[in-house]
């Protein structure tokens, strides 16, 4: 009997945890949205995944990292372009490959 109460207590703690963290509310909202869909999707699981993924608030750090990534990509492209120009400029001052081999 004591084992049964311990398991029940653990379940109750877990239920409260899910409730406090907003999991139950979010799951309920997504399931209600699926229920209210006029045309049910072919994959209910994909529907849930899509809506649960969209339900999480965007972390501000993620947005900052996205912006930083975009900036770094631009800088990278500029550096690659500059590198091409410098190689072309350098090639003007270097002797052709045949002259190098003769030396």
Swiss-Prot record:
Give the Gene Ontology MF terms in alphabetical order. Answer: transcription coactivator activity
Q: Where is the signal peptide?
A: none
UniProt entry keywords in alphabetical sequence? Cytoplasm, Mitochondrion, Nucleus, Transcription, Transcription regulation
**According to its UniProt record, where is this protein located?**
Cytoplasm; Nucleus; Mitochondrion
Q: Does the keyword Ribonucleoprotein apply?
A: no
Report if keyword NAD is assigned: no
* InterPro entries noted in UniProt: AMY1
So what does this one do?
May control the transcriptional activity of MYC. Stimulates the activation of E box-dependent transcription by MYC.
PANTHER family, A to Z: ASSOCIATE OF C-MYC AMY-1, C-MYC-BINDING PROTEIN
Subunit relationships: Binds via its C-terminal region to the N-terminal region of MYC. Associates with AKAP1/S-AKAP84. Interacts with MYCBPAP. Interacts with CFAP91.
> Can you tell me which family this protein belongs to?
Belongs to the AMY1 family.
| The protein's name in its UniProt record | c-Myc-binding protein
- Organism annotation: Homo sapiens (Human)
Name of the encoding gene: MYCBP
């Amino acid at each position: 009997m004591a084992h049964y109460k311990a398991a029940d207590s653990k379940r109750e703690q877990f239920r409260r945890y899910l409730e406090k963290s907003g999991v139950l509310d979010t799951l309920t909202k997504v399931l209600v949205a699926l229920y209210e869909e006029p045309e049910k999707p072919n994959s209910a699981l994909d529907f849930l995944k899509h809506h649960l993924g969209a339900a999480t608030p965007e972390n501000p750090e993620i947005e900052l990292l996205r912006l930083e990534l975009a900036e770094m990509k631009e800088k990278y492209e500029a550096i690659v372009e500059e590198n091409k120009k410098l190689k072309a400029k350098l090639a003007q001052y270097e002797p052709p490959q045949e002259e190098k081999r003769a030396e």
